[in-house]
UniProtKB/Swiss-Prot annotation:
GO biological process, one term: conidium formation
Annotated function: Tubulin is the major constituent of microtubules, a cylinder consisting of laterally associated linear protofilaments composed of alpha- and beta-tubulin heterodimers. Microtubules grow by the addition of GTP-tubulin dimers to the microtubule end, where a stabilizing cap forms. Below the cap, tubulin dimers are in GDP-bound state, owing to GTPase activity of alpha-tubulin.
Gene field: tubC
Repeat recorded as keyword: no
Residues the record lists as binding GTP: 11, 69, 138, 142-144, 204, 226
Species of provenance: Emericella nidulans (strain FGSC A4 / ATCC 38163 / CBS 112.46 / NRRL 194 / M139) (Aspergillus nidulans)
GO cellular component term, pick one: microtubule
Subunit and partners: Dimer of alpha and beta chains. A typical microtubule is a hollow water-filled tube with an outer diameter of 25 nm and an inner diameter of 15 nM. Alpha-beta heterodimers associate head-to-tail to form protofilaments running lengthwise along the microtubule wall with the beta-tubulin subunit facing the microtubule plus end conferring a structural polarity. Microtubules usually have 13 protofilaments but different protofilament numbers can be found in some organisms and specialized cells.
Protein name as catalogued: Tubulin beta-2 chain
Major location (coarse): cytoplasm
């Protein structure tokens, strides 16, 4: 079976990750300690994508939990799902990265990384046919961003032909934890562009908006935000975990979603999002789901896709949905919003179906889009980065850990290149595409010579 090894690093990564495990262990009929209590064979059929069977009907998540300080781990271990994880898979330091990317990537994190790789190797060896890795982390802090990206590049070295998906929480415009977020995020994006195959961009700001506007929560907690993220994560992987008519795995998703290797930063959305109070007043239908899924306010990435164009997008419907109805709806959507799709990639919307709905819903849909408007997100970070870097503010925290200013300059220019690549494809048309393509091929040949 196509197994996935899950790594969660840093405080944010661990909290998002534990919400994810809570969601999918519920979907597979496991109780809080991993004992199977479900009633459907479908739940067991592909349990081993994410779980190892321990014996005695107990299933253990194939998760590696990593942090540079013990606090988050202790909280997880004593939390409601603490008994779910394998105790050897908690790996933590005692020092904390202190929101410093350099500590996570070069000093503190580097000391711990071999230990982590050993555990990852052990998890990978217990798989029949490892499909890839997924990492949950934030890009604003020190551990998730610095050590998270270090792990990604180490795993890349060791497993070069496996997929690497990351769920990355971007620093948001309004909610800032630390003043050095722009540095940490830029340095991380610099790594993700090179080493990740698919990065699902999440954003606290967008998540807050959804909680307040759509779910009508007056003061959302991180628990509420993580619940939204776990719904998307569960939706993206559902076709691996349950049988369906159209299955997609991480690799198929990447093949369909990534037209150019560097442009693998996706916007995600989920439907139905209804407040608990109003959910009983509406029936969920396929048109309703599609409508809500393409609503820019329901995107979990703080970038408005209407300012850019979709290179590709993928939708996953779950529940008792008629294939034909979904295809008709998707066709309508593409016609209605045709100006938001690039016309030089025909059939750029891919649909997958799965017969198993999430807990408590009759049907649901997950949206993943590769939109050029994701550059807004990078642009925001880049502007803050430039403002601080021009004055060399806070740089001594990084150089003190052995980093060089050159690295910052490289990361900055890589991010600017990424933005201009997105912009280039946003403006490309069918006719001028040919010329541009030849030019690029020509460059490639010259470099090879």
């Amino acid at each position: 079976m196509r197994e996935i090894v899950h790594l969660q690093t840093g405080q944010c990564g661990n909290q998002v990750g534990s919400a994810f495990w809570q969601t999918i262990s519920g979907e597979h009929g496991l109780d809080a300690s991993g004992i199977y209590t479900g009633d459907s064979d479908l739940q067991l059929e592909r349990m081993n994508v994410y779980f190892n069977e321990a014996g005695g009907n107990k299933y253990v998540p194939r998760a590696v939990l990593i942090d540079l300080e013990p606090g988050t781990m202790d909280a997880l271990r004593s939390g409601p799902n603490g008994a779910l994880y394998r105790p050897d898979n908690f790996i933590y330091g005692q020092s904390s990265a202190g929101n410093n990317w350099a500590k996570g990537h070069y000093t503190e994190g580097a000391e711990l990384v071999d230990q982590v790789i050993d555990v990852v190797r052990r998890e990978a060896e217990s798989c029949d046919c490892l499909q890839g890795f997924q990492v949950t982390h934030s890009l604003g802090g020190g551990t998730g961003s610095g050590m998270g990206t270090l792990l990604i590049s180490k795993i890349r070295e060791e497993f070069p032909d496996r997929m690497m998906a990351t769920f990355s929480v971007m620093p948001s415009p309004k909610v800032s934890d630390t003043v050095v977020e722009p540095y940490n995020a830029t340095l991380s994006v610099h790594q993700l562009v090179e080493h990740s195959d698919e990065t699902f961009c999440l954003d606290n700001d967008a998540l807050y908006d959804i909680c307040i506007r759509t779910l009508k929560l007056s003061s959302p907690s991180y628990g509420d935000l993580n619940h939204l993220v776990s719904a998307v994560m569960s939706g993206i992987t559902v076709s691996l975990r349950f049988p369906g008519q159209l299955n997609s795995d991480l690799r198929k998703l990447a093949v369909n979603m990534v037209p150019f290797p560097r442009l693998h930063f996706f916007m995600v959305g989920f439907a139905p999002l209804t407040s608990r109070s109003s959910s009983s007043f509406r029936t969920i239908s396929v048109p309703e789901l599609t409508q809500q899924m393409f609503d820019s306010r329901n995107m979990m990435t703080a970038a408005n896709y209407q300012n850019g164009r979709f290179l590709t997008c993928s939708t996953l419907f779950r529940g008792k949905v008629a294939m034909k109805e979904v295809e008709d709806q998707m066709r309508n959507m593409q016609n209605k919003y045709s100006s938001y799709f690039v016309e030089w990639i025909p059939n750029n919307v891919q649909t997958a179906l799965c017969s198993m709905p999430p807990k408590g819903l009759k049907m649901a849909a997950t949206f993943v889009g590769n939109s050029t408007s994701v550059q807004e997100l990078f642009n925001r970070v880049s502007n803050q980065f430039t403002a601080m870097f021009r004055r060399k503010a806070f740089l001594h925290w990084y150089t003190g850990e052995g980093m060089d200013e050159m690295e910052f300059t490289e990361a900055e220019s890589n991010m600017n290149d990424l933005m201009s690549e997105y912009q280039q494809y946003q403006e490309a048309t069918v006719s001028d595409g040919e010329g541009a393509y030849d030019a690029e091929e020509g460059e490639a040949y010259e470099q090879e010579e």
